[in-house]
């Protein structure tokens, strides 16, 4: 710390970032601030699940992720295990508010409904405390009491009444207005009703609302009246006020129930409001959070059900108007031109963040959007090569360069993977042929030689698809591979093979092999494969890695110690495999190898199973909604009776006029959206809110440049001769609500640069202590040459202490200026969320 003081004298103050303008200091609160939520993490494994009571104690388990009770993600089934190992990563945008993020562990049942073993429920406000940590969570028992969620809007009033015999009493008026976010029952919206009770030491008067059908957000708007008995000592002189001894003993209890016609009604939650809230006021109105029963089921011990290992990272970004991000973007975008690159803002970001992955994804997206990624990766890869002494270890570590390039391949290489691997992966996953070649793992009736032939056939087919795909390799990947190859050859001039291994270590090891191993993660398959197929894909992935590596070496040796794998790999030691690998690597690392510009093949964007409402029908009924397989390309949206069948209906992308959400009240169904096109409006129901959001986003982006897009739309359906939203009778009536703001035509499909810059700002904000440490290290190096006394200083890569110090000062200045509008927005948000409002409901009793 002592070195920091003289550093200020040794290093000059950093100038402002050139080419940027300060945003006007107006009222930014009046402009739109986008609040965007996302969740990523990994479900590792469950342990010590309860066994079956019979002789077969094993279970077939899977895990789901739920926003409250809405399932948004499901793992593969792990068969015959009480400690299933899932090891599945997830990432999704969260398009709505929620109370709990829950993980349910199920036992798969073929003949009956899947059995819920237990769950992990984490309150939204507690998610940040678990961020980035591997944590074991105890599974909790599941019953109606543990599933309580939602809130109630309530109004209480106190009136004075004179009875028929002339006595005076008080009348308590209870207005139950609405509920919001009630739990799902068996995955469906419930049929809720409420009981309203006035409870005291000697009374329990109960009344009941009407049942509302198929909704999680019922609008009751029912009023109930209760007489409050007065004590004999009451006189008119005591004014309009309930006496203290009566107030303290009375409370209003509201219980929510799901109406079950044939079985017992299901408890949904309760609230208790003491009548003394009216002590100082004749009325009280507020939202209350539903609570479980006080005497809930406490018999099951959480530890008895097992535990679940998770890693979670929940982010909530407050994205300001674009002009606020100008200085930070300018600082980041000049990073490729900074000499040395280790003194650039982008490189410093990677140095100081706790988890480099948090910085890499937004950084790659931002640089890619502005065509700055290739020179930046080239510069940081060159820095990696300076520290690499062994040619066999080239680009094998998890440096900033390797992580940036890996993320870039995931972003730009999606279509490349689909056209290259999807056909053969579909064949592998749908054929269910056994490829197990380890005698120890063979199933009864399997033949090793037959399995070996199956595996050879698949590996050869995958290999042929890869080495024949160079024409489809994205240009930006080719440009970076070319740079890597040139730098590797320059660094190790006496090794003719290193230029190939520099490219192979990315395209085979970090791209194709990973996609083969986890096709669902790359959107190559709609569902996770079964256990046998997972094993087949693992063997194929390992073999492809080895062959790709062999093509870059003079000596071809297997790393596998198992003789069965070594014997199998001998089948691929023909010279043609090595020649094909080198030819492929030559083609994708040449500056002349670009994407074919004349291809008319549409880009496959998204597919999945959803429900659509029959077009042209006027009756409301379940049979009007049919399950269909939807497929979106860059040219058209189609739906099919089943996956792989011919299209039943096609909507050209150029004919899409708008894509908007549809109000739940239209068909009493959640997660609906509408595709408005030139012929008719197509109503679609997604399986959950995350899926609906992804489809809406992708459809909006692919049709964003259509010249005939609508400026307004109807948020409800046209049924029985009128629009449900505005009651207009003509189907051609212009929309009654403005369309969602469109995306500017110059923004690339997958990149929201303001959000990516906001993410980078958040990473810098969370890493300020380490940034300060790096600044002190620069000062120490400038003053004291040689080994540094502070051990933490050696962890930083500082080639030019003066240049690095100046950049750090610019970063700190830019972050401080961004802090101001963020703090103003947070204060405004917290002050507007009054306790008892819908956004901030009352929890428990108030007095």
Curated annotation (Swiss-Prot):
Region (Disordered), start-end ranges: 1-31, 819-847
Modification N-acetylalanine occurs at: 2
SMART domains per record: BTK (SM00107), C2 (SM00239), PH (SM00233), RasGAP (SM00323)
Ranges in coiled-coil conformation: none
Pfam family name, one: C2
Biased composition annotated in UniProt, kind: Low complexity: 1-18
Phosphoserine PTM positions: 554
Zinc finger (Btk-type) stretch: 706-742
InterPro entries for the chain: C2_dom, C2_domain_sf, PH-like_dom_sf, PH_domain, Ras_GTPase, RASA2_PH, RasGAP_CS, RasGAP_dom
Binding site for Zn(2+): 714, 725-726, 736
Residues marked Arginine finger (site): 396
GO cellular component annotations of the record: plasma membrane
Every PH domain range: 603-704
UniProtKB keywords: Acetylation, Cell membrane, GTPase activation, Membrane, Metal-binding, Phosphoprotein, Repeat, Zinc, Zinc-finger
Reported tissue expression: Widely expressed. Higher expression in brain, placenta, and kidney.
Principal subcellular localisation of the protein: membrane
Biological process terms in GO annotation: intracellular signal transduction; negative regulation of Ras protein signal transduction
Subcellular location: Cell membrane
Listed name of the protein: Ras GTPase-activating protein 2
